[in-house]
Curated annotation (Swiss-Prot):
It comes from Cereibacter sphaeroides (strain ATCC 17023 / DSM 158 / JCM 6121 / CCUG 31486 / LMG 2827 / NBRC 12203 / NCIMB 8253 / ATH 2.4.1.) (Rhodobacter sphaeroides). Keywords: Cytoplasm, DNA-binding, Repeat, Transcription, Transcription regulation. PANTHER family: TRANSCRIPTIONAL REGULATOR MRAZ. Signal peptide: none annotated. Belongs to the MraZ family. It holds the Pfam family MraZ. CDD domains: MraZ_C, MraZ_N. GO terms for molecular function: DNA-binding transcription factor activity; transcription cis-regulatory region binding. GO terms for cellular component: cytoplasm; nucleoid. One of its GO terms (biological process) is negative regulation of DNA-templated transcription initiation. It is found in: Cytoplasm, Nucleoid. This is Transcriptional regulator MraZ.
Length: 168
């Protein structure tokens, strides 16, 4: 995939659970939607798995993942787990004319956004991770990011040292 999801964006979530997809992410979603010819584009929001965020994939990327799942032997625990968490616990999403989506109830539940927080207004963080992007509740994202960096990298270390294992 030539296009990649990059960057970190904080977006307001309104009382109706609407949130604007960052403009750079919209371009990648459009490029990865084979049916897009202007107007509304689509992507897949996955809320399965044991995590505090939802993952979002372009239609093309999700088709590649589905093909990999199909290649696993039917009925195996690995295939059933992936089918449940990547296919069953996923929704096709369509951006409205303003580039927004309505965060679905299952997605809001995964993020930990309560009805009271929606009424008062809350914020979501969109984090690009190459072939997908994540949507987090903003305060959860900030806490997780700080904790992860503390564990992975000593202060002052070169972050590219984490790539040494790749052999590239």
């Amino acid at each position: 995939m030539a296009e990649a999801f990059r960057g970190e964006y904080n977006q307001k979530v309104d009382a109706k659970a609407r949130v604007s997809i960052p403009a750079p992410f919209r371009r990648v979603i459009e490029a990865g939607d084979p049916k897009f010819s202007g107007g509304r584009s689509s992507f897949v929001l996955v809320y399965g798995g044991d995590r505090s965020y939802v993952e979002c994939y372009t239609i093309s990327e999700m088709e590649r993942i589905e093909e990999r799942i199909r290649s696993l032997p039917m009925g195996t625990p690995k295939r059933r787990y992936l089918e449940r968490n990547m296919i069953t616990l996923a929704l096709n999403m369509e951006l409205d004319e303003d580039g927004r989506i309505v965060l679905p109830p299952k997605g809001r539940e995964k993020l930990g956004i309560s009805p009271d927080e929606l009424k008062g207004g809350t914020e979501a963080t969109f984090a690009g991770t190459l072939n997908k992007f994540q949507i987090w509740k903003a305060d959860t994202y900030a806490a997780e990011l700080a904790a992860e960096e503390e564990v992975l990298l000593p202060p002052g270390a070169d972050m590219l040292s984490l790539l040494e294992e790749t052999g590239l």
